[in-house]
């Protein structure tokens, strides 16, 4: 979508992919206004470009329209399609039996956890709310956990004390231990990555794995380069 999130997501993807595969060529881009996508026109434009693969960052109702039009017109056939956020229950569930097959996505496969902290969180959430968690539920819970942890470490609600306490703050979460890095206070929470498929009339993630943020975040040297004045 044509706003900061979409622009940043595409820029980051291009940078990372070019670092891994310098000869890759980006042959077309479509920038629909957020929640105002003309999916038919967008799909036609992409099809005319004949890409080998597609990187999609639309979500919500835009994603539903794009998937429907793209499937109807055969856009995704024979093409690897990547969908940022497309495996998150908030966006995958509404697609129901129209969910795409074989997209590589980030998401939250709450239905496949068999044991451990992830399973414990899902069970507790379902018992409390009589519904399954989404990625927003997980992030919200981890945010509260982090606030509690930093207040306990700081021993104060003073802003400076909290700032200092966030450096190398460790938190035990449903996805495992995370740390807020000293250099930028960025958490090392990672992402679940897998492929979409249909199961029981709805979309799910399969062949997924959890990628630790610490394995992918910018190095200290890169962080310093990005800071104004450096």
Where are these regions (language model features)?
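A structural signal for well-ordered alpha-helical segments within the folded catalytic domains
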Residues: 64, 141-145, 160, 187-188
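Extracytoplasmic ligand-binding site segments that recognize negatively charged/polar headgroups
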Residues: 1-13, 89-93, 138-144
